[in-house]
Swiss-Prot record:
<feature type="active site">
    <location>
        <position position="32"/>
    </location>
</feature>
<feature type="disulfide bond">
    <location>
        <begin position="152"/>
        <end position="188"/>
    </location>
</feature>
<dbReference type="GO" id="GO:0045087">
    <property type="term" value="P:innate immune response"/>
</dbReference>
<dbReference type="InterPro" id="IPR018188">
    <property type="entry name" value="RNase_T2_His_AS_1"/>
</dbReference>
<dbReference type="GO" id="GO:0004540">
    <property type="term" value="F:RNA nuclease activity"/>
</dbReference>
<dbReference type="GO" id="GO:0043202">
    <property type="term" value="C:lysosomal lumen"/>
</dbReference>
<keyword id="KW-0964">Secreted</keyword>
<feature type="disulfide bond">
    <location>
        <begin position="42"/>
        <end position="89"/>
    </location>
</feature>
<keyword id="KW-0456">Lyase</keyword>
<keyword id="KW-0325">Glycoprotein</keyword>
<dbReference type="GO" id="GO:0003723">
    <property type="term" value="F:RNA binding"/>
</dbReference>
<dbReference type="GO" id="GO:0033897">
    <property type="term" value="F:ribonuclease T2 activity"/>
</dbReference>
<keyword id="KW-0458">Lysosome</keyword>
<keyword id="KW-0378">Hydrolase</keyword>
<keyword id="KW-0496">Mitochondrion</keyword>
<feature type="glycosylation site" description="N-linked (GlcNAc...) asparagine">
    <location>
        <position position="116"/>
    </location>
</feature>
<feature type="glycosylation site" description="N-linked (GlcNAc...) asparagine">
    <location>
        <position position="73"/>
    </location>
</feature>
């Protein structure tokens, strides 16, 4: 179960919700998870306990909600899944070896990386005009100094272009940024991409 890197996964709620209906999705990038590469469900006898992250709940609800289901109970199911599948593996690291540390550190990374404000400062905002994938990638490399992984949903019938879905930043085992390896699942094609604005 040895893993080599962590992947900080941000997703864009409008794209997630385009696939399914959501009520009032956040209009900012939220956390999908902090995932060790190449492993899952490392310890089935370490159940998720919401009491351990009580102090983190206000931030969890804001930055790590279950975008598809707005009820708070659903977010607990989502966090349980993330802990059982990914957190139990991440816990190999001292910095992440409890539920409080795993969720707390992920929130810290989210705030430090500040993807939302970074994209805005770069002038990359949700728009009905399209962006070029290469422009988004190069802009992010300029800020973070590493190559991110940008993931898209392919165009559905009637759509002209792919839709921006997730942005991943990769970290070493000592939580330093590193290049994300190419390629991967659902990676974006070169060319135009739609970064969907919130529905009115």
């Amino acid at each position: 179960h040895e893993w080599k890197k962590l992947i900080m996964v941000h997703h864009w709620p409008m794209t997630v919700c385009n696939e399914k209906n959501c009520e009032h999705p956040p209009d900012y990038w939220t956390i999908h998870g902090l995932w060790p590469d190449k492993s899952g469900e490392c310890n089935r006898s370490w159940p998720f306990n919401p009491d351990e992250i009580k102090g983190l709940l206000p931030d969890m609800r804001l930055y790590w909600p279950d975008v598809l289901h707005s009820s708070p109970n659903h977010s607990v199911h989502f966090w349980r899944h993330e802990w059982e599948k990914h957190g139990t593996c991440a816990a190999q690291l001292d910095a992440l070896n409890s539920q409080r540390k795993y969720f707390g550190k992920t929130l810290d990374l989210y705030k430090e990386l500040a993807l939302n404000s970074t994209l805005q400062k770069l002038g990359i905002k949700p728009s009905i005009s399209y962006y070029q994938i290469s422009d988004i990638k190069h802009a992010l490399v300029g800020v973070y100094g590493v190559v991110p992984k940008v993931q898209c949903l392919p165009p559905k019938s009637g759509e002209k272009v792919q839709t921006l879905g997730q942005i991943e930043l990769c970290l070493t085992r000592d939580l330093q940024l590193q290049d994300c390896p190419e390629p991967g699942l659902e990676i974006c094609e070169d060319g135009p991409v739609f970064y969907p604005p919130p529905k009115e």
